[in-house]
Design a protein with these regions (language model features):
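Acidic, metal-coordinating helix/loop segments flanking the phosphotransfer/catalytic sites
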Residues: 501
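Glycosyltransferases that elongate glycans
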Residues: 1-475, 487-488, 505-520, 524-526, ...
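Active-site donor/metal-binding and catalytic loop motifs
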Residues: 480-496
């Protein structure tokens, strides 16, 4: 098919909110804070300890407010145009999709397969998609669930695309609907009932497998590799579940199961280690120029999500403006009034849009599209020629694998075509090589986790990796399609929320004292000053409670000591004079 005529209309637009009133209010508050600090400082010698504590706390609050105002100053209104992209081209670049799961108990396989099904059914040529599922728990139930889901996918995906179903996660599509829409055709109603029955059977099989693992999963057949293994002590397991051998656009995408090798004496580096294995395995199997990573509980809510991301990648005037595309994390079935703040609505609405107008949003660990060459450590405008990419350098930096070296060279070389970069061969023909790059000892002596890939050194590997990318000069894009691109489930109980927020606070604070901290990135890298301030705003989250608690107990302390920490007005002074 001949390429379509190029259109002069932009694939995306970024407008800025006219938030002049809110800016004025924020600056006025900042003026009041500075006035209070000046008064505190000038009168400090006339007061005691409580005055000094108030000065310290209020100085902290002023500093945080400066970071807040800076981050919210330029709020963006991004807009993408997938129809224009479809008019412009019919030959799209390939995308490798990464879905990560680690515990079949905390992350039930039924949730994982719904995420996978929603991603396999997106509006994008199937011969340009490959979905890799990383199972860090090496669970036979997870693998069995994916095998059964792949059978259901042969019915579900054609059904979604034929009838243009907008919600393509089965558990959400069928929830609350006991019968098909009455205003639909007779044919649709019959197919709807059949698909729902098939999905019920799929759910029952997975639930039975979860409670009766050995009986349901035939350990003597394709599941033999899972026998007598432990989640933290097993060899690499790679299974090609679905394969689009014919390379047809309206078929089913590749689906590959991966459980990387784990040994007790080898650090596995948690999710960052799993993501690096996915990057290498996909590099030797399909080598798509773009990669999407999604948590197993974040299903694709918008079937055109990849087209929205491609509007940025293919529409950017300069690659530096789009190192990665981040979709905000929204959630379904949250508690009314959101008492724990798990929905993060205010953060996305103001802070997310604000940093979108600086150097771009942070990498949030899910719902993010990456350029493969950026993950491989390439800096903006860095040009690598065939003569400048020595085989010895590739093996020392990326690992000793001929096939991986070839795919990396194809990705990094200047002028490489992103369409031709994709490996159209069958993934099953690279199983042995994939086992090699998925082994736990492959990274030793290389730059994985240090200068390329997902970085090690923090439990919030996503923020650290995104910070390192932006410190090299790359910008990121904030994409807000309607409906939301991805929806996930947030904790609904207090203890679970505290555990999650403790992990976030600890990990973000770790990054602040990392060798790749935002301050280092600004002083010695290409991280913009206001972007550094935005990173500081979130990374200092763990310290805020100290000053807030201290300030909160000052009134009680003053009552006990018969003192005061708030400035007295004229009325208070007049009242005191009258009393005396």
């Amino acid at each position: 098919m001949a390429p379509k005529a190029p259109s002069s209309l932009p694939l995306y637009e970024i407008n800025y909110r006219k938030n002049y009133i809110s800016r004025g209010i924020e600056l006025f508050i900042l003026f009041l804070l500075f006035s209070l600090l000046a008064y505190r400082f000038l009168t400090l010698k006339y007061h005691g300890l409580q005055w000094l504590l108030a000065l310290i706390c209020e100085s902290w609050f002023t500093f945080i407010w400066i970071l807040t105002v800076s981050a919210k100053w330029n709020q963006v209104e991004p807009k993408t145009y997938p129809p224009r992209l479809l008019e412009r081209t019919c030959n799209f670049p390939a995308v490798d999709i990464f879905v990560t799961t680690a515990d079949p108990v905390l992350e039930p396989p039924l949730i994982t397969i719904n995420t996978v099904l929603s991603l396999l059914a997106v509006d994008y040529p199937a011969n340009k998609l490959a979905c890799y599922v990383s199972d860090d728990g090496a669970s036979i139930v997870t693998y069995y669930s994916l095998v059964e889901a792949s059978k259901f996918a042969k019915l579900w995906i054609p059904f979604c695309k034929k009838y243009n179903i907008s919600l393509r996660a089965p558990f959400r599509y069928f929830s609350g609907n006991s019968s098909p829409p009455q205003d639909s055709s007779q044919e649709f109603q019959q197919v709807w009932i059949r698909i729902k029955d098939e999905y019920k059977q799929l759910c029952k099989k997975i639930e039975d497998a979860s409670t009766q693992e050995p009986e349901t999963c035939d350990v003597a057949g394709d599941f033999a590799v899972f026998s007598n293994i432990q989640p933290k002590n097993h060899p690499t397991i790679i299974k090609v579940i679905l394969e689009n051998k014919e390379g047809v656009a309206d078929g089913l995408p590749h689906l590959v199961y991966i459980s990387r090798e784990k040994r007790p004496k080898h650090p596995h580096q948690f999710k960052a280690g799993a993501m690096n294995v996915l990057t290498r395995v996909s590099g030797v199997m399909t080598n798509a120029p773009f990669m999407l990573n999604v948590d197993c509980d974040m299903y694709a809510n918008n079937p055109q999500v990849i087209l929205h991301a491609m509007c940025y990648f293919l529409g950017a005037k300069d690659e530096i403006d789009c190192g990665f595309v981040q979709f905000p994390q929204f959630f379904y079935d949250g508690l009314k009034e959101d008492p724990y703040g798990n929905q993060l609505k205010v953060l996305h609405e103001y802070f997310g849009r604000g940093i979108g107008g600086i150097q771009g949003p942070f990498y949030q660990g899910s719902g993010c599209f990456h350029r493969r060459k950026v993950i491989y450590g390439l800096s903006p405008h860095e040009k690598i020629t065939a003569g400048g990419l020595k085989d010895e350098y590739i093996k020392k930096t990326y690992g000793k694998s001929e096939k991986l070296s070839t795919s990396i060279a194809k990705t990094l070389l200047e002028g490489s075509n992103i369409i031709e970069q994709f490996n159209s061969d069958s993934p099953s023909s690279f199983i042995d090589i994939a086992h090699q790059v998925g082994s736990c000892g492959f990274e030793y002596g290389t730059a994985w986790g240090q200068k390329l890939g997902w970085l090690y050194g923090s439990v919030t590997e996503d923020v650290l990796t995104g910070l390192f990318i932006q410190s090299r000069g790359w910008k990121s894009a904030y994409c807000l399609p309607d409906p939301a691109a991805f929806l996930g489930c947030a904790p609904t109980a207090g203890p679970a929320t505290m555990i999650q927020q403790k992990r976030w606070a600890t990990g973000l604070f770790e990054v602040l004292f990392n060798s790749k901290s935002p301050i280092i990135g600004t002083l010695f890298g290409k991280l913009q000053l206001r972007q550094c301030m935005a990173y500081l705003y979130v990374q200092l989250w763990a310290l805020r409670s100290i000053f807030e608690v201290c300030y909160a107990i000052l009134p009680a302390y003053c009552l006990i000591t018969n003192s005061y920490f708030l400035p007295k007005g004229k009325y208070d002074q007049k009242f005191k004079t009258t009393q005396s």
